[in-house]
Amino acid sequence: MGVKNWNNVIPWRWVGLEDISPGTIAIDLPNYLTRRLTVMKTTKSKDGRLPLAHVGAFLGLVRATLNSHILPVVIVDGPPESRKRPPNPELIQTANRLYQEFVKDGDPYNEDISEALWKSRAMRMYFATNHIKDLACVIGIPSITAPSEAEMIAAAMCRDNLVDTVVSNDVDAILFGSPHVTKQLQVSNNRILRVRLEELETHMQLDLERLRDLAVLCGCDFHEGAKGIGPRKGALLLQRHGGLLEVLKAIGATHSIREDFIRAREVFDEPSYLSTDGIDLRLNPPIVPKLTRSLRMVMSENAVQTTVEKILRLWKGFGTQQSSLEQWI
């Protein structure tokens, strides 16, 4: 969900790709997949084929970014925040089981798997997340499982200058302290739609601490918010009273209600305690045999050969590597 009614207050700007190129980007994979799956084909294929459009989308992203001297880093969710509605564990377990069956059988026309995936967009998302994580590994793209929310560790990585932006349309990435967030990545058009934290602070006349207060007042993933308070009214209240607790007192919130708001607000402070030490963001050599096998599950032999050759060329051209390609083949 992100934060309620913030779409029109974020000063997103179209800028040239040079804003992040050459560089490294952290991709909030759950957010990215959710957006992609909403525009992908949603009706069952007549030939019974599994919904695997995410593979082409991811390979296209990898080719476009590497070709523009941008290293994509895939970030996936860990355990959800305690105040966030937890995902359906049975759904996740089923998606994981279906994916393992798919990897074992290598059959993109498996009727049982296909039927289950076409019935549930959420199931497809979890399946696709597993698939893309494995593809990233064999391609050589860094893949990280977050301690909690993907956008939280991604924001910490951007804060610590490990990456140049966080690719997500969830404003939580900004509130978690990322100084640069990209909503749309249009590499082929040589542009991105992004916001800088300092621009949002200036636009709203609130610093990061007060922006976090505002998010909780408006309603976010961790609290339903205060009734009747949107971003502009909330900003005025914070400017007038100084902070979340003071605003809650001013509007007559009881002690127990104030405590609940404060506990939700504390979630946004968690990135301050996250360490990015030891995170390795190098582009590794493609593991050609495993990549070839993975691609054979989803495309023709000619397409596999062409795709592998393109990825190898991109890897060779991206930068100097310590390992020789031969030891990986």
Task: Report residues per predicted region.
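Nuclease catalytic cores that cleave nucleic-acid phosphodiester bonds
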Residues: 122-261
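Acidic-enriched, low-complexity/disordered segments with a strong bias for Aspartate over Glutamate
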Residues: 19, 28, 47, 77, ...
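Non-catalytic nucleic-acid-binding/docking modules located in mid-to-C-terminal regions
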Residues: 8-10, 14-21, 197-329
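Generic serine detector
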Residues: 21, 45, 68, 82, ...
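A short alpha-helix capping/helix-coil boundary motif
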Residues: 39-42, 109-113, 133-134, 190-192, ...
